[in-house]
Design a protein with these regions (language model features):
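Regulatory input/activation interfaces that engage signals or partners
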Residues: 2-151, 155, 161-165, 169, ...
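The N-cap/first-turn positions of alpha helices
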Residues: 290-294
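PAS-family sensory domains
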Residues: 160, 183-243
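Short amphipathic alpha-helical boundary/capping segments
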Residues: 279-287
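Short helix-to-turn junction characteristic of helix-turn-helix DNA-binding domains
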Residues: 298-302, 341
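PAS-family sensory/regulatory modules and their coupling/dimerization elements
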Residues: 225-274
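Recognition helix of helix-turn-helix DNA-binding domains
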Residues: 288, 301-336
Length: 343
């Protein structure tokens, strides 16, 4: 087993740093896992580390996009087996569905999503590292094949942290950059079932931008906001999602409408602002709290000596933190760093 785990970890590391896009990332991670945990399909989601909603998605031979709303129902509104939040905080970050145990009889995911689409077993993994959940991964087997075993669940548990770090490496594989767009922000109003009631012109462009590489029709685009709307209704407040795009970062915000019908929400989509994006970037790029303090002052335009006085540290310490920030963000100078963060 040790050799198999080491081989899988090596493949996972290569995928995180070498994947050109989200689709390739998912494909290469699936291939790295296939020796230890054979599967027929997968669904990978990266999560905004602050709001915990899906910010990118990749899958092959997996659940249909429309059925993902039923999957979210099992996470937020009904008590289904192995919700990712429970796996995140539980003793194991791996859960298996489809083993035939009594507790699965009323599973919405098993009966309404998996069975109608020909899947008999699911092994889901909460991709946790450093106390945060960076993504989720569901591995699928077709009906008629053996269920995922306890031994395979143990193998998957060994790969939780490497998989989480691979997602971080993928997002942080190059310096951040502002998304330049002359298009106005999109504003979309949805009802309690997440059907679009009204939208500004050009909204489809922004929805599609949140799914780079997506080739489906416009009627499937609401999958880009479903996780945010479920979370906003659960929290009864606004939910911000920061979406990595090949040309920069996109910011989405879902929030309940005052005085509206039950469940109605407004969703705005636009290029991410520095204020919104910076906390997520510090997480993705592994910035320490002290480095983050220096970074926030630098973004405000303060020179090194003034940053030192404000933070009550030496100028030498400030310079050390700035050098660490240059390395983590993949830039060579302060001007380049600030340009990368000028959203």
């Amino acid at each position: 087993m040790a050799i198999g785990v080491e081989r899988a970890v090596s493949g996972i590391r290569g995928a995180g740093g070498g994947a050109a896009d989200v689709q390739e990332l998912g494909h290469e991670l699936s291939r790295a896992l296939s020796g230890l945990v054979p599967h027929d399909g997968y669904m990978l989601a990266g999560l905004d580390p602050l709001s915990q909603v899906s910010c990118f998605l990749s899958g092959e031979h997996t659940y249909s996009y429309p059925s993902l709303r039923h999957v979210l129902l099992g996470e937020f509104e009904v008590s289904d087996r192995h919700p990712f939040t429970d796996l995140w905080h539980g003793a194991s970050q791996v859960g298996v569905l489809g083993s035939g145990v009594r507790e699965e009889r009323n599973s919405l995911r098993l009966n309404e999503v998996m069975a109608p689409q020909g899947f008999g077993s699911e092994l889901r993994i909460a991709l946790v590292a450093g106390g945060l959940m960076w993504g989720t991964l569901a591995l699928l087997r077709e009906r008629g094949r053996a269920c995922f075993t306890a031994a395979e669940a143990v193998h998957a548990q060994c790969l939780v942290a490497p998989l989480a770090h691979a997602l971080r490496r993928f997002v942080a594989r190059r310096p951040p950059r502002p998304l330049r767009s002359a298009r106005p922000p999109a504003v979309i109003v949805v009802d309690g079932a997440d059907r679009i009631r009204s939208a500004t012109p050009g909204s489809a462009y922004w929805l599609r931008a949140c799914l780079p590489g997506f080739l489906g029709t416009d009627d499937i685009l609401p999958i880009t906001y479903w996780h945010s709307t479920f979370m906003a209704r659960s929290l009864k407040g606004p939910v911000v999602n920061r979406v990595p795009h090949p040309d920069g970062w996109i910011e989405t915000r879902a929030q309940p409408l005052a005085g509206a019908a039950a469940g109605e929400l407004a969703i705005t989509i636009q290029p991410a602002t520095t204020r919104t994006l910076l906390p997520a970037l510090t997480a993705w790029y592994g910035v320490t709290p002290r480095e983050a303090a220096v970074l926030h002052e630098a973004v405000e335009g303060l020179p090194g000596k003034q940053i030192a006085r404000r933070l009550d540290v030496s100028p030498h310490t400030v310079n050390d933190h700035l050098k660490a920030l240059y390395r983590k963000f993949g830039v060579s100078a302060r001007e380049e760093l600030l340009a990368a963060l000028a959203h």
